[in-house]
């Protein structure tokens, strides 16, 4: 059976990784995805030289076509501020724009650990807007941080990881909030599984029984 190529994004030049979809005011779906040259002899290890693209589709599942290259970066995650601007996180930086189809300005977040140990560094960040309009962020190590408006300084509010209390090598958390609660899925590369967690406030998390997904 041939592979279904209309789901997501296909390209003979770029090898894509990750991806975050946001519906724009133009009614189209925008996939923010990073990629490196398919021709690279390093293969996946070329990821430090990734670029971030804005790919567009009329459908949520694609096919997406890369419209423009935003700049260098890896592991993109996009979110929208209360004032309508878009923030595109990448490892060790972020881009900001007034127009999802416009030009993006590069900058960096400010972090204040507040005399707490930073858990496994600040990479692979994931964000969710809180009920009061502030933003919570969970970093790769499982520490929680809060910013007043999503761009202002992020302050660490935990001194231990929020992940399940089991031995594991956790990374790539993804958090979001719906009208009821906060949700998180996090990978454990040691156990080769992923866990699903829930929270009422985005700070104290409960791990649901079972696994979000596992090999096979």
What does each model-found stretch correspond to?
Residues 1-216:
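Carbohydrate-active catalytic/glycan-binding domains of CAZyme proteins
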């Amino acid at each position: 059976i041939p592979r279904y190529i209309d789901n997501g994004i296909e390209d003979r030049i770029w090898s894509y990784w990750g991806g975050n979809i946001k519906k724009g005011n133009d009614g189209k779906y925008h996939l923010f995805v990073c990629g490196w040259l398919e021709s690279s002899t390093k293969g996946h290890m070329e990821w430090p030289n990734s670029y971030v693209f804005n790919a567009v589709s009329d459908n949520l599942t694609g096919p997406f076509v890369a419209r423009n290259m935003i700049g260098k970066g890896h592991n993109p995650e996009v979110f929208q501020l209360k004032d309508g601007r878009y923030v595109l996180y990448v490892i060790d930086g972020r881009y900001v724009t007034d127009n999802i189809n416009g030009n993006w300005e590069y900058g960096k977040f400010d972090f204040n650990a507040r005399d707490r140990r930073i858990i496994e560094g600040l990479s692979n960040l994931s964000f969710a807007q809180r009920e009061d309009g502030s933003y919570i962020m969970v970093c790769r190590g499982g520490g929680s941080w809060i910013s007043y408006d999503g761009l202002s300084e992020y302050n660490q509010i935990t001194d231990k990881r929020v992940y399940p209390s089991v031995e594991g090598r956790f990374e790539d958390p993804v958090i979001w909030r719906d009208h009821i609660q906060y949700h998180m899925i996090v990978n454990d590369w040691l156990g080769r599984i992923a866990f699903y967690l829930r929270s009422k406030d985005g700070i104290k998390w409960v791990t649901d029984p079972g696994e979000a997904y596992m090999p096979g």
